[in-house]
Curated annotation (Swiss-Prot):
Residues bearing the modification Phosphoserine: S108
E.C. number(s) listed in UniProt: 5.4.2.10
Alphabetized Pfam families for the sequence: PGM_PMM_I, PGM_PMM_II, PGM_PMM_III, PGM_PMM_IV
Name this polypeptide is given: Phosphoglucosamine mutase
Stored SUPFAM superfamilies: Phosphoglucomutase, C-terminal domain (SSF55957), Phosphoglucomutase, first 3 domains (SSF53738)
Organism of derivation: Nitrosomonas europaea (strain ATCC 19718 / CIP 103999 / KCTC 2705 / NBRC 14298)
């Protein structure tokens, strides 16, 4: 059954436009609460379920948080409020506190005027499709506030950030530290603003923290993992050894070398996997996505490490890991899942696993990646309006087929609709940069023209 509200990463949209409104979040909190009450058989009859609500630093988070907590309370569910906190911190605390669910109000890497919400189960993992469908069914039912004696209580969780900082540090080996390492940490003016730099500092690094002054409007603005050029400039300015950039909700990470070279999620997962293989600690294979560079897949093959591709989206990477009983997966955008360390993608913990590899071996990022000659890969995001279906458009199909014939076996083409924004993503990969750029531009322009024609009816 197709879902009405939930996409690949929860619910997301423009603040003030349905469904990112206080009214909807009130009803959503109530609906989730009713599903929790009906499904949790382990609670005693006189106990209420508890939900932890976290958020990033968007100005709209306060408004939506208030509506959501009211909905939970009306359903008879207790609420803990953490304040601004990274998405993976909420996933961790749900497990650590042994409560029934977590909610994160965030639009991740999107601009400040977007927002959204994602939920975590008591196991700290994304909700299954079946539960999201139950929630959507409950949303169609009228609200009926529980009797006053059964209303949920709301309180603030003290030291949520401190608990999470200690958890992050626990994933780094006790026998190593980061002394002598100068690190620039770009916090994207997001949920990691009061956490990421502290983790690195407490492990001994000389830390320069940038974009750690959120004002409600500057999240992801020309900073963080979506604007890596800012970190590249900071690295050179501060003569740092390495740079770390997270996104607005802290679930993805990119890294930059002292020379200013970018290392994406593909590269970082390869470094972690190669190091674990050297230690004899790699369990199973590695999960990537349809976007993973072909050179990385070939490099894993040379190392004898099994590799498989999931659809784009960290929930699909996580599902593939669980199916194969593997423990490491990544997207090139920087979502990296180390299942032996955490249940979800975590920017800080992923960066620590890379730093572990560097400190343990004495190698640099470049040293680890020397045997991976990346294929040129061009990604173009094409904005579209309405419900343009590129899959059934003959002109788009013809252009794609022409490109595939030109690239042959040395290239890949991927067209997909974004699950969170009105975009069609065009990815072309090949051995020759000029040819890769040419076909990416041509396919993107064909989509633009066909989408415009479909809107005008011509």
């Amino acid at each position: 059954m197709k879902k009405k509200y939930f996409g690949t990463d929860g619910i997301r949209g423009k603040v003030g436009d349905f469904p990112i409104t206080p009214d909807f979040f009130l009803r959503l909190g109530y609906a989730v609460g009713k599903v929790l009450l009906a499904s949790d058989r382990q609670l005693a009859a006189d106990k209420r379920p508890t939900v932890l609500i976290g958020k990033d630093t968007r100005i709209s988070g306060y408004m939506l948080e208030s509506a959501l907590e009211a909905g939970f309370s009306a359903a008879g569910v207790d609420v803990l409020l953490s304040g601004p906190l990274p998405t993976p911190a909420v996933a961790y605390l749900v497990r650590a506190l042994r409560i029934q669910a977590g909610a994160v109000i965030s639009a991740s890497h999107n601009p400040f005027d977007d927002n959204g919400i994602k939920f975590f189960s008591s196991a700290g993992s994304k909700l299954p499709d079946s539960m999201e469908l139950q929630i959507e069914a409950e949303l169609d039912q009228p609200m009926k506030t529980t009797p006053s004696i059964k209303l949920g209580r709301v309180q603030r969780l003290r030291d949520a950030a401190g608990r999470y900082i200690e958890f992050c540090k626990s994933t780094f080996p006790n026998q190593l530290d980061l002394r002598g390492l100068r690190i620039v940490v770009d916090c994207a003016n997001g949920a990691d603003y009061h956490i990421a730099g502290h983790v690195m500092h407490e492990l001994g690094a000389d830390v320069i923290t940038t974009h750690a002054s959120p004002d409600g409007f500057n999240i992801n603005y020309e900073c963080g993992a979506t604007h890596i050029e800012t970190l590249q400039g900071s690295i050179l300015q501060h003569k740092a050894d390495i740079g770390i950039a997270v996104d607005g909700d802290g679930d993805r990470v990119l890294m930059v070398s002292r020379e200013g070279v970018l290392y994406d999620g593909d590269s970082l997962a390869y470094i972690i996997a190669k190091h674990r293989q050297q230690l004899g600690e790699l369990q199973g294979g590695v999960a990537g996505t349809l976007m993973t560079n072909l050179a990385v897949e070939q490099a894993f093959e040379r190392l004898g490490i099994p590799f498989a591709r999931a659809n784009v989206g960290d929930r699909y990477v996580s599902e593939l890991l669980q199916q194969n009983d593997w423990y490491l997966g990544a997207e090139n955008s920087g979502h990296i899942i180390c299942r032996d360390k955490h249940t979800t993608g975590d920017g800080i913990i992923s960066a620590l696993q890379v730093l572990y590899a560097l400190r343990d071996t004495g190698l640099t990022l470049a040293d680890f990646m020397r045997d991976v000659p990346f294929f040129p890969q061009r990604l173009i995001n094409v904005k579209v309006s309405g419900n343009f279906d590129f899959r059934s458009n003959p002109a788009v199909a013809a252009c794609k087929n022409e490109a595939e014939q030109a690239l042959g076996n040395d290239g890949r083409i991927l067209l997909r609709a974004s699950g969170t924004e009105p975009l069609i993503r065009v990815m072309v990969e090949g051995k020759v940069l000029q040819q890769t750029d040419y076909w990416a531009e041509k396919i993107a322009e064909t989509i633009r023209q066909q989408a415009a024609s479909s809107m005008t009816g011509s």
